[in-house]
Each structure stands twice: as C-alpha cells, then as structure tokens.
Amino acid sequence: MLPEQFCVRMKEMLGEEYAAFYASYDLPKYQALRINPLKTERDTFLLQAPFSLNRVPWTTNGYYYSGNDQPGRHPYHEAGVYYIQEPSAMAPAEYLMAEPGERILDLCAAPGGKSTQIACSMQGEGLIVCNEIHPARAKILSENIERMGVCNALVTNETPQKLSDNFREYFDRILVDAPCSGEGMFRKNEDACDEWSPENVENCAARQAEILDCAAEMLKPGGRLVYSTCTFAPTENEGSISRFLERHPEFELLPAEKKDGMMPGVPAWTDHPAEGLEHTIRLWPHHLKGEGHYLAVLQKAGVLSRTCQGYCRNGVEKGISEKECKEFFAFAEENLVKNITGNFLKFGDQLYRMPEGMPSIRNLKVLRPGLHLGTLKKNRFEPSHALALALRPDQVKHVCSLESDSPQVKAYLNGQTLNMDGEKGWYLVTVDGYSIGWGKLAGGILKNHYPKGLRKNG
C-alpha cells in the first residue's frame, strides 16, 4: 500500500500521467544483469548465457532477464561474470563517462553496482575510491569489488567530511548516488514504504546537501560530478541540485542525452530553480522498464588536467620492498605464467597490490587497499580468493576446468574436495573458463580453498 501523502504529492506533480504511474506498481518488477567486461566479452557471454536476455537501452552491458531465470544461483554469478542490478540504477555510471587512468570517487558506493560499473570503464587503469559510511554495507561493497575482479579500487568506510579533509581537488570524476527516501524502491522493497514520511524526505535533502558540499571540495577544476537518487521527491532532486548551485556557482549543469523513455527534470517543481534543470534526467516507471531514478550531470569551472595532482593530506602510499614479500614472488614463479608487478602493501600478514599512485591511507578506515593477493606465512604464501577472481586461466600454470552444469561445480561451491590427476600444487578452478577460486592438489585430491563464508549448502 503506497503512503497516502506520497500519492497526493505525486498526483499534484504528474496530473494526467498519475494514473499510468500508479498502475505501474501493479506490474511485475523488471530484473536485469550487467555483463562484466573485466571477465568476458559481451558477445561471448551472450552466446553461452543460459538465460533469456534483452538489452537495457541506456547502458552498454545491461540486459533484462526473465522472471523465470535465476542468475543469482548460477555459478557465473560466483565467478563475477555479471552483476545483478536494477535497470534504472545502471544509468548514472554511464553518464559519469569514466576513462582508464583517471582518479574517480564513488562517494556513497554500497552495495557496489555503480562502483563495479565504473571500474569496468576504467579497464583496471587509474584509481577508483569506493566509499561507504555504514560498516556492514561497506563490507558488502568490498565483497562485490572482489567478486567482480576489480584490481584498482581503494574501499573505504569513512564520512564524506573525513574524505574531503584528506582530498582537495583530487578526483577527475565523482559519483554521488545519494542516500534518499527511496520512493523508487516501493515496488521492490515494502520496508521503503513503511519508512517513508515527508519528514524523512526533508532529512534526506539536508543530508544530500552535506554530501554534495564535500564532493565539490574533492573534485578537480573541470571535473565531472554526477548526482543521482532513486526517489521521485523534487526536494531531493531538482531542489537539491538548485540549492547546491546556489552555494556553488563554480558548477554548471551539462546537457545530458535522454535515451529511450527518459524525461527531463522539471524546474517548476522546486522554488528558485537553477538554470538548466531541464538538462537533468528522470527515469519514470511508467515511461520505461525500470523502478525509477533521477540524475544530474554537473561540471566544475576550469580545465581538467591529468597532471594536476590536487591535495592529498598524507601524500602517496609508499608500500614495501620486494624482499618483504619474497614468499609471494616464490609462489608467483611457481604458479603464474607472468609475475605480478606493482607497488605492494602489507596489512599485518595480508599482502595487497596497490593501485598506481594510491594515496596514503594513514588515518583512514580502509577495507581493501587494492588487489588482495593473499597471506604471507612463514616460508610460504597462500593466495587469496580475490587473486583467483582477478586472474584468467591463461595467466596460471595449473587449471582445474569444470563445466557449469557438472556435479563437480556444485561440489566445489559446497566446499568439497575433488578427485583429479596432475602435478601437485595450486590450481585455479574455472567454470566454463571463468575463474571461480583456488584448489590445492596433492595425492590425487584437490583440497578446496573456496572461502567458507561463500560456500553453498546443499
């Protein structure tokens, strides 16, 4: 049951369109996945996908799937071949237009759909900082970064204010997918209905202002800022943007192409509308196949320069010498076709390869400072699950190849050992050629190293 005050407001906003908007809540929700180009070519996946797929028109790799399909239960999901994501939510990252080699911030990043979408555009080059203020959600974010094979992410659990104190005019692009009243989630999540109130809308708008002000400080001159919400409330959309532009005249709204059913923002829905509000975008559930979203593309005055370093409070993270992680290099020589190079960082006995030019993480709450390589133990190295998911079969010397419909895949994901012949040592386990985890072979038995917390029962 939709909140009465919400319905009254939407009727005032939409007029003759309200009936179609209201009727959209009786339709089945649209479900989609986004193919991960860090793991597979789109055309390759479409040929082998065991699902009925239809293109999401506003994103390169997004596809609707049938309600009868269950891609979340397929081994490809565990291998990070795709990310299950609400179709409307795929739009904001497209408009960020991320490029390889840039510094990018996803300021409110959990659960990770938009971060991993941005990372795909970066192709492993540059730095993406993925931040989430809530610890439990930050953990989920970090797990999704791992599953999708992202190597150049710094995952933090900080307030926007703390980040803005550390980074001034540092990022080329910033996405603010702001916490909101979640009106676009009503069909998907009944709790969103129960938690809604006009007071919550106002509280969200106030919080959005604080977040946007922090983002403004962290963006380089000439940089791009994309703001998005999954709500319909003008106070949180056209209103939040108009008030932001009043406070920050150094920003302007950029025209953004409206694709396949997208509609413009409406200046009349807010007091003192900013110039160019019609350039912002609304995704309505009665105009397209999605739950609904709002987004605005803004640019900061100035000329964007990759050579502009910006301000980073504690400089660049120094890392450690190769001598301090000699166990890893011994493992790599024995098991990898080509050594992994870069700058390395130790967290206790955990070893990471940092993204190039990663800033100092001193005084920051960090969950993942780059690619987790594994654990340094006395005279040996144990590779991480993240490393398995970041590697391709042609990058390792030993592979255990399984087919997605085989009982061995189910057994492996359940944590069981597998019988196989071969040289003893570490094996990258794959499903239809996609990396899914590690096993260690000795005496014809492949010991299972799939993480206990991810294992499927039954």
Tell where the protein language model's regions lie, with residue ranges.
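Polybasic, low-complexity RNA-engagement segments
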Residues: 1-13, 17-46, 291-293, 301-458
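Conserved AdoMet
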Residues: 34-90
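Conserved class I S-adenosyl-L-methionine
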Residues: 101-110
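Conserved SAM-binding loop of SAM-dependent methyltransferases across substrates and taxa
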Residues: 111-124
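Helix-to-beta-strand junctions that scaffold the AdoMet/dcAdoMet cofactor pocket
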Residues: 123, 219-221
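S-adenosyl-L-methionine
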Residues: 131-169
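Mobile active-site "lid"/loop adjacent to the S-adenosyl-L-methionine
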Residues: 136, 173-213, 230-237, 264-269
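Class I S-adenosyl-L-methionine
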Residues: 171, 224-227, 232-352, 357
